[in-house]
Each structure stands twice: as structure tokens, then as C-alpha cells.
Amino acid sequence: MKGQETRGFQSEVKQLLHLMIHSLYSNKEIFLRELISNASDAADKLRFRALSNPDLYEGDGELRVRVSFDKDKRTLTISDNGVGMTRDEVIDHLGTIAKSGTKSFLESLGSDQAKDSQLIGQFGVGFYSAFIVADKVTVRTRAAGEKPENGVFWESAGEGEYTVADITKEDRGTEITLHLREGEDEFLDDWRVRSIISKYSDHIALPVEIEKREEKDGETVISWAKINKAQALWTRNKSEITDEEYKEFYKHIAHDFNDPLTWSHNRVEGKQEYTSLLYIPSQAPWDMWNRDHKHGLKLYVQRVFIMDDAEQFMPNYLRFVRGLIDSSDLPLNVSREILQDSTVTRNLRNALTKRVLQMLEKLAKDDAEKYQTFWQQFGLVLKEGPAEDFANQEAIAKLLRFASTYTDSSAQTVSLEDYVSRMKEGQEKIYYITADSYAAAKSSPHLELLRKKGIEVLLLSDRIDEWMMNYLTEFDGKPFQSVSKVDESLEKLADEVDESAKEAEKALTPFIDRVKALLGERVKDVRLTHRLTDTPAIVSTDADEMSTQMAKLFAAAGQKVPEVKYIFELNPDHVLVKRAADTEDEAKFSEWVELLLDQALLAERGTLEDPNLFIRRMNQLLVS
């Protein structure tokens, strides 16, 4: 062999191989699914390239996958006549993992094998799964359109290095030979291999054939028997497809080992003709928050594969959706650029978006437990929707789930429809609070009056919530109201103050004036409030003022944050406020007011600029 060289695996490959062999062994037969799936992808890519260059078929347009084994040599071979690989492509695809974030992903894996197998499964192990059952793997490949002498040989024992060399290979495509480990003889059994192919590959449009050897007139005659149906699953009638087939097809296109939560298969005819098969995964992909990674549907045009990860058909907040679209209205030579500006694309995107939202609404109604699984995995992504998709805002809002004072649990299970159905007579607004954590939201002094009145408050503690609520202004005709902002409806909820209380409040006017003079420009205003029952003071913001949580979002993003001007509200019935009002010594009065303000700021922001000063001030007042 010419041009032979030995190279070391990228470190992530070594780590993945080790984890995979140990974590996936209990489900080892999936290696055959993965290798056949890769062969199917190679055929799809050849079909696509041949649209503009039919010579790539080299006179052989009947694409297929073939599986054969040699019991004497203990080898299993999977071959295809797809697009094949050049030497550079072999090194890129078989020696490295070209995915950003791989290293941190692998470092996150621990010793929990069940969990590891799920995570590795969604990572998409593909070719490397061969090493689960093989102690050596040999690859012979030639790219379509290359000369026979430009074939490539690759071999590795899956430990630390691999060998690559130039060979002559007459037929294009890729041939992968697995040298099976001791104890893996089941994969040399014709019936066993056939059953695995039927189980995992019935839905693939490409014929999968197994070698048949027969003795005729003293000679061995080799023929090939087709094992799978070889009809693209989405082209079949829905009534003929079993749930098991839908699940296996999902695993094929998503490279996921887990079953999907739900799916929707639709054929649309009329002004636009297309078929869609959309899946909601049961687990978030490891790279869902990686902005560099493309997320999208597989695109077919008239059953011809065009591209993976076509992002144009699904809004970003639905980037977790997996599946495909097969359109009859797009040209076969369509490119990502053409898709970007196409009216057909926009119409398909709108239709598919509505389809997914309807699918999620149905899941929420039919199976609350499954929907809760969805929400735990993808709720944060769906919360991007109200800002991104105004046209579907009401439909998205119905799908949102929140923690609430009604359930007294951190689990986000309350829908806006649930909340509205429980609103008190005369209640006009949907009340909510945003905070850094569920505990901080639940114990906020802003809730005291509402708890006393039995009015439900949504407790929002995800980082995205404050941003989302800037766009989500109402639901079912009811406006949202943050309880940390000054609002007339909140003041109305306070009990009517009797005449004697009003007189007592008038008597506190000089006290309020003293506080204003002391704090000056540090606060926007100082006033008395009847919204508190147990707390001496709170800070709140005007409706047009930036909220505390929004200021934190800006700061976390490294942006300049304008100073939040708070309104300092004091509870006239609280013993500490009364004590401060009765204090004539200006130095001690200042200590009391500063302590009450710091307490209110600490409850609102979770931090103080000078916590040591706060502690000293509190200690001085405790001993005085």
C-alpha cells in the first residue's frame, strides 16, 4: 500500500471510544443500525451531488447497502455504493470529532452507565459504535468521481491510533469490515443479522441486502437478498405504519437512542404539496444551547435528499424539533440561500410552526405527565417564543408552565389557563414575580398582601423569565402585572383604612419627610404602604422603570446597566418603622432608616454593595 502513515486519534475520540464500549454494551446491536444509517446518508449525498453531475453514478445508479459475514475469519462487512470518501475526508471523519463543545460534553459524563448511554446516544456515535463488538475495524473507500487508484484504506484497533494508506478500489463507496471480538459470534448468524436489519432498517428508503451463498454444481453461488421494505417511511400511508416503526425512524434520523415523546405525520395537498414528519424528542440534545450548531429538519424535494439541518423551516424557539419535510414545490437545485428568500419556505415555516404548537397542545391535554417531561427538557427554549413569534404568541402562552403560590411547589406545572380559571371575583390582572430562585420568589415580601387575600401569584425564577415578560403583555384579555412594580390594582387590594388610621398616617408625614431628606437622590420616592403585613419595608419600581431582574440580565450580558431608581415603601403598622419614627437622635435615626433600606434592597436584589456595613449597623442597633 502506498502513502501509508499511522496517526493518533484526537483525544476526544479516545475518550468517546472508551466510554461507549463500556456504556453501550448492553445495547450492542445498535452498531448495525448506526453503520446502515451512515450508508443511507452516503447514498442520499450521492443522489444530491448527482443532480448536477450524473457522471458521479459511474454507470451504477442502483444504490444499496450490503451486509455479509465470514465465519472462518470472524468478520462482518457493511458496504455501500454511496458517495465514498477521499483521504482527507477519511482523516476528518474517522480520526476526529468535528463538533464544538465535544470536550466539555465528554467531561460531563460520569460513572452512571444508564445516564452515560443516553447521553452518548444523543451525541450520535455513528461509525465508532463498530468498536462495541469489534477489536479491529478496517475501512476501504473511494469517493464518487475519483479514479480507482485514489481509494483509501483505514484501520484501527480503537485504542490510540489508526493507519491510513492509498489503495486501488474499482467500485466507489465504502466498505467497513468488523473483526469481531471473542464472544460476539451472534453477529455471524444469518438469522440474527437479518432480524436486526429488519428491526432497525425497515424504514430506510435504500435497499439493505444480505449475502446468500448456495452450492450449485460443486460451486458456491453468491446472490443478495433484500431484507427491508426499502420504502421511505414518510411516503407510506399513516394507517400502515406502526408506532414501533415511527420510533425506529426517529432514532435513525435523530441519532438518538431514546424514544420520542410524540410525533406528527401529515401529507398536505392543494396550493402547496408537502409531507412532514415531525418529532418531539424525550431528552434535550447535549448541544441545544450551542449557537454554532445547526438545528433543523432534513429537507427532501420530491423524495430526493437535499440537506440536513435546514433551519429555515422552524423558528429558533422550536429548534429541538426533529424530523423532515418533503416538498414538491421547491426546485431540486435549491440552496440555503434560495431557501432564505423563498415565499414557499416562509409558507412552509408558518404551517410547520402551527403544526408543532398544535402537537404540543394536544400532548398537554392528552398526557400531562408526558408534557411535564417535555417542559422540563425544553421549557426554557419555548420561553424564547413570545419574543420571537408575535403571530403565535397566544398559542405559545397556552403551552407555558409556571410555579405558583397555589401549588406551593417549585415544579412548573401551572398553565395560564389554570391561573385565569382561579382568578378572584373582580381580579383584572395576572400577578407574577421574578427572582433569582424559586425560594427567593416564594418568600418575597411583595407577596404578603396577595397571600393574605388568597390571590395566586406566578413565581418566575428562570433567567429568561424577565425578558420573556417584556413581550408577553397579556393572556386571554388579562394584562400581566409584576408585583414588584407600583400598580394601582395592588394598592386597591389593601384594606380600606379607617379614619383613625388616616390620622395616624398624617402624624407620620414629618417622619416621611425626614427619610426623604436623609436619602435624597438615592431613592425615587419614599411613601407609606398597606401592601405589607410582616415586613417593615420594601423597594419597588415604577411601571416604566427597569426592573431588578432586567438590570441583572443586562449586567450578565456585559452591558452597561442604568441605575435602577427604587421607591422606598414603609409599613406604618410595623414596630421597627414606629421605632424609627419615634427616634429623635439624628445619628440613630439615620442608622434605623439605612438598616430598613438595606433590608429592603437585600430582599429585592439578593446582594448589597457593602454587606459588612449592613452587619455592623445591625449589630450596633441590636446592642443599643
Curated annotation (Swiss-Prot):
GO terms for molecular function: ATP binding; ATP hydrolysis activity; ATP-dependent protein folding chaperone; unfolded protein binding. Residues 553-624 are annotated as: C. SMART domains: HATPase_c (SM00387). GO terms for cellular component: cytoplasm. It is found in: Cytoplasm. Gene3D superfamilies: 3.30.230.80, 3.40.50.11260, Heat shock protein 90, C-terminal domain, Histidine kinase-like ATPase, C-terminal domain. Residues 1-336 are annotated as: A. The keyword ATP-binding applies. SUPFAM superfamilies: ATPase domain of HSP90 chaperone/DNA topoisomerase II/histidine kinase, HSP90 C-terminal domain, Ribosomal protein S5 domain 2-like. Residues 337-552 are annotated as: B. Disulfide bonds: none annotated. Molecular chaperone. Has ATPase activity. Belongs to the heat shock protein 90 family. This is Chaperone protein HtpG. The gene is htpG.
